[in-house]
Amino acid sequence: MDIALKEKTDTEMVFVVSGVTVPFINAIRRICMMEVPKLAIEYVNMYRNDAKMFDEVLAHRLGLVPLAADPEFAESLKMPEECDCEEYCSECSVSLTLRKKGPGVVYSGDLVSETPAVKPVYPDIPLVKLGDDDELELEAVAQLGVGREHAKWEPTTACAYKYYPRIEFSEDCDECLECIEACPRDVLGEESGKPVVVDLENCSMCKSCVRACDKRAIDVGYEEGKFIFRIETDGSVDPKDVLLKACDILRDKAEQVITFCEGG
């Protein structure tokens, strides 16, 4: 198996992996989405809400606010099902408070965490509008969870792969260049009067170029066992950490099967 990193930011990672099968790469994708733990608001204690918005709606909005947590702090928290408490405690949760008086808009940045290790990723997410003399006071309790339980715990906003494209020109090409105009993603270009591939990895294999070529001189396909994998997050977890954790989870599952087969 070979892996080549193509792009990496705080919220996105793109890499090319070859020498693997669809079931393997799809297992990584599903674990990234559904089984990698992430911190999100689970409980809201509403002490005062004068806004023209139901408590339940506001609580739902709070649950979808992305929270950035220091990796070491997040690792120290217990999963709720592993904790001995009834609902939440300091070992499995972190508290955020919000107090604001109108008029004005309440933003995610108004949430004050009990620890500097946890804070909203984006401070400018509008939550609710307060009128004159309206007040809002609440406590939000964040816990670890996984995406299969609720979308708010999904660390990825997009996690997908596609086959690595392949484009070939035959000797029948009459250099009409119609294929270049037909390509919607600027994958093809011109060089010395001939069509050439200039951005292969951007190809979606839509075959618009094939349909535009009367000579059928273009063959568009994919390389077997080679994929372009893209991970995007909401900023709460680094995409590299998501991938590493997903691999750890997959390895643990495989080791459990091995132990079972060996009769352990």
Swiss-Prot record:
Annotated GO CC locations: cytoplasm; DNA-directed RNA polymerase complex
Cofactor: [3Fe-4S] cluster
Cofactor note as given: Binds 1 [3Fe-4S] cluster.
EC number(s) reported in the record: 2.7.7.6
Top-level EC class as recorded in UniProt: transferase
InterPro entries in the cross-refs: 4Fe4S_Fe-S-bd (IPR017896), DNA-dir_RNA_pol_30-40kDasu_CS (IPR001514), DNA-dir_RNA_pol_insert (IPR011262), DNA-dir_RNA_pol_RpoA/D/Rpb3 (IPR011263), RBP11-like (IPR036603), RNAP_Rpo3/Rpb3/RPAC1 (IPR022842), RNApol_insert_sf (IPR036643), Rpo3/RPB3_RNA_Pol_subunit (IPR050518)
UniProt keyword Iron, yes or no: yes
BP GO annotations: DNA-templated transcription
Residues annotated as binding [3Fe-4S] cluster: C203, C206, C209
Subcellular location: Cytoplasm
Domain of life where this protein originates: Archaea
Catalytic activity as recorded in UniProt: RNA(n) + a ribonucleoside 5'-triphosphate = RNA(n+1) + diphosphate
Keyword terms: 3Fe-4S, Cytoplasm, DNA-directed RNA polymerase, Iron, Iron-sulfur, Metal-binding, Nucleotidyltransferase, Transcription, Transferase
Signal sequence interval, chain numbering: none
Gene Ontology terms for molecular function: 3 iron, 4 sulfur cluster binding; DNA binding; DNA-directed RNA polymerase activity; metal ion binding; protein dimerization activity
UniProt xrefs under HAMAP family: RNApol_arch_Rpo3
Assembly mode: Part of the RNA polymerase complex.
Family: Belongs to the archaeal Rpo3/eukaryotic RPB3 RNA polymerase subunit family.
NCBIfam families for the chain: PRK00783.1
Record-linked PANTHER family: DNA-DIRECTED RNA POLYMERASE, DNA-DIRECTED RNA POLYMERASE II SUBUNIT RPB3
Function: DNA-dependent RNA polymerase (RNAP) catalyzes the transcription of DNA into RNA using the four ribonucleoside triphosphates as substrates.
Protein's name according to its UniProt entry: DNA-directed RNA polymerase subunit Rpo3
Organism annotation: Methanothermobacter thermautotrophicus (strain ATCC 29096 / DSM 1053 / JCM 10044 / NBRC 100330 / Delta H)
